């Protein structure tokens, strides 16, 4: 006797009127999934069709909830890695749309009708902007670090300060990347102090490169010292070695003056080392990419590495990066949203907060607070901001707002919305969404 005879047929579930609005492939998948799950935990109790349909609809709603969707970033973290880091300006997107939605000359030379370079147009703009000999783009800065080390130092040794052997989000650790690239690591100095003589004394027959890694996601305070890249480059040059700066998150132009103290500018650094790399979607404010700048002969070696094929970027990334570079070269900084959010003055942020507060149906308090740069950038710096605080259980409010795709934060046991990271074009949507929420 079939013990599952009480189960409704899959077809009857799929064809039920209550599932009519869902796509066929969604209905088939979740009807089968729920029935299989119940069969695994089968009891002798009769399984009703209504109970199954209820579970199927619950699964479908959870599935849709997990889909990629836009959110309002009210966290106060400008370059929020979990929320996609830098936002692309609508005008840049419109400029890219014709290329993205059609065939393009991504790797085709329109002059001679032959295969062209995937990177040519972007690389010329990178050289213009940063005044470097040559450049290359890969899919992120971790890939850039791996490619540089594997291409220039394979089976050899690199020297790095113990205080710069960083770990970033997702357990990306510099020592492990060095090892994976087929390179031996020589650690020098201590966690808080490293001197030029430490590097000099560590140089041996198998040394190929001196590596400096910018501490972009943590800060050392108090009794500490490090060697700048210029001095490391001079030492490397004297000893016939290479110097490489893994910058991680560097700034280019027009950044808030409160943030730039002790923060290296890319254009200056590229003149002080043989090769450097940084992320395209952090302080640079563009698409995810690993941007490599440096000496022409070194970049040529990177281009010859078979790994480059695996690390190359697609036409979407190239399109967005190309338009961002145009904006920088034309000094049209308003199109770089990350810069705008970091540069917005306090009075502008206050106006946004007051507008929302005025139109909300709920009691809130306007307060001054601090925003963060985020994205593993400038951990020791913050920016003045205005927040709205909401009365009630902070954790419950945070969850309730998150269900409406509004990502706030908890500060001093209060749920708050930070208006530095809420864009002007999101204010009306924010007001309508909050006013439609019940039982706040």
UniProtKB/Swiss-Prot annotation:
InterPro entries the UniProt entry points to = PyrdxlP-dep_Trfase, PyrdxlP-dep_Trfase_major, SelA-like, SelA_trans
Which superkingdom? Bacteria
The pathway this protein participates in, as annotated, is: Aminoacyl-tRNA biosynthesis; selenocysteinyl-tRNA(Sec) biosynthesis; selenocysteinyl-tRNA(Sec) from L-seryl-tRNA(Sec) (bacterial route): step 1/1
Its function? Converts seryl-tRNA(Sec) to selenocysteinyl-tRNA(Sec) required for selenoprotein biosynthesis.
What name has this protein been given in UniProt? L-seryl-tRNA(Sec) selenium transferase
Q: What is the lineage of its organism?
A: Bacteria, Pseudomonadati, Campylobacterota, Epsilonproteobacteria, Campylobacterales
A GO biological process held by the record: conversion of seryl-tRNAsec to selenocys-tRNAsec
Cofactor(s) listed = pyridoxal 5'-phosphate
Gene assigned in the entry: selA
Kindly report, in one word, the top-level EC class recorded for this enzyme.
Answer: transferase
What is the species of this protein?
Campylobacter jejuni (strain RM1221)
Q: Which residues carry this modification: N6-(pyridoxal phosphate)lysine?
A: 282
- HAMAP family the UniProt entry points to: SelA
Give the reactions, separated by semicolons, that this protein catalyses.
Answer: L-seryl-tRNA(Sec) + selenophosphate + H(+) = L-selenocysteinyl-tRNA(Sec) + phosphate
Family the entry assigns? Belongs to the SelA family.
Q: Which UniProt keywords apply?
A: Cytoplasm, Protein biosynthesis, Pyridoxal phosphate, Selenium, Transferase
Where does the protein end up? Answer: Cytoplasm
**UniProt key word Transferase:** yes
Q: Which GO terms describe its molecular function?
A: L-seryl-tRNA(Sec) selenium transferase activity
């Amino acid at each position: 006797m079939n013990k599952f005879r009480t189960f409704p047929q899959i077809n009857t579930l799929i064809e039920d009127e209550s599932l009519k609005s869902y796509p066929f492939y969604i209905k088939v998948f979740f009807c089968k999934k729920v029935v299989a799950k119940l069969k695994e935990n089968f009891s002798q109790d009769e399984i009703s069709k209504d109970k199954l349909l209820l579970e199927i609809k619950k699964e479908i709603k959870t599935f849709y909830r997990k889909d990629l969707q836009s959110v309002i970033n009210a966290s106060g973290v400008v370059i929020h890695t979990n929320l996609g880091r830098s936002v692309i300006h609508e005008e840049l997107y419109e400029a890219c749309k014709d290329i993205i939605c059609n065939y393009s000359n991504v790797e085709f030379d329109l002059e001679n009708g032959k295969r062209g370079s995937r990177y040519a147009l972007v690389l010329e703009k990178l050289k213009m902007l940063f005044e470097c000999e040559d450049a290359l783009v890969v899919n992120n800065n971790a890939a850039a670090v791996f490619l540089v080390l594997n291409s220039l130092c394979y089976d050899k040794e690199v020297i790095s300060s113990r205080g710069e052997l960083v770990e970033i989000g997702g357990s990306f650790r510099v020592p492990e990347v060095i090892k994976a690239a087929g390179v031996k690591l020589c650690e020098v100095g201590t966690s808080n102090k490293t001197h030029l003589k430490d590097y000099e004394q560590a140089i041996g027959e198998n040394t190929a490169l001196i590596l400096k890694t910018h501490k972009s996601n943590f800060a050392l305070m108090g009794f500490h010292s490090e060697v700048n890249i210029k001095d490391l480059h001079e030492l490397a040059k004297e000893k016939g070695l290479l110097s490489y700066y893994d910058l991680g998150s560097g700034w280019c132009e027009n950044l808030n003056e409160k943030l730039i103290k002790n923060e290296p500018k890319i254009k200056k650094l590229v003149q002080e080392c043989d090769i450097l790399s940084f992320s395209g979607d952090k302080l640079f404010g563009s698409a995810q990419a690993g941007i490599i700048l440096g000496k022409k002969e070194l970049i040529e070696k990177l281009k010859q590495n078979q790994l480059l094929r695996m690390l190359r970027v697609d036409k979407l990334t190239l399109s967005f990066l190309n338009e961002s570079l145009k904006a920088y070269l034309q000094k049209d900084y308003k199109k770089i949203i990350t810069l705008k959010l970091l540069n917005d003055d306090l009075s502008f942020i206050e106006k946004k907060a007051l507008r929302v507060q005025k139109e909300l149906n709920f009691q809130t308090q306007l307060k001054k607070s601090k925003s963060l740069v985020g994205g593993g950038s400038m951990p020791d710096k913050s920016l003045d901001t205005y927040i709205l605080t909401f009365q009630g259980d902070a954790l419950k409010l945070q969850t309730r707002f998150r269900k409406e795709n509004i990502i706030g934060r908890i500060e001093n046991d209060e749920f708050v919305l930070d208006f530095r990271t809420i864009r002007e074009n999101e204010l009306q949507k924010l007001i309508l969404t909050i006013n439609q929420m019940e039982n706040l």
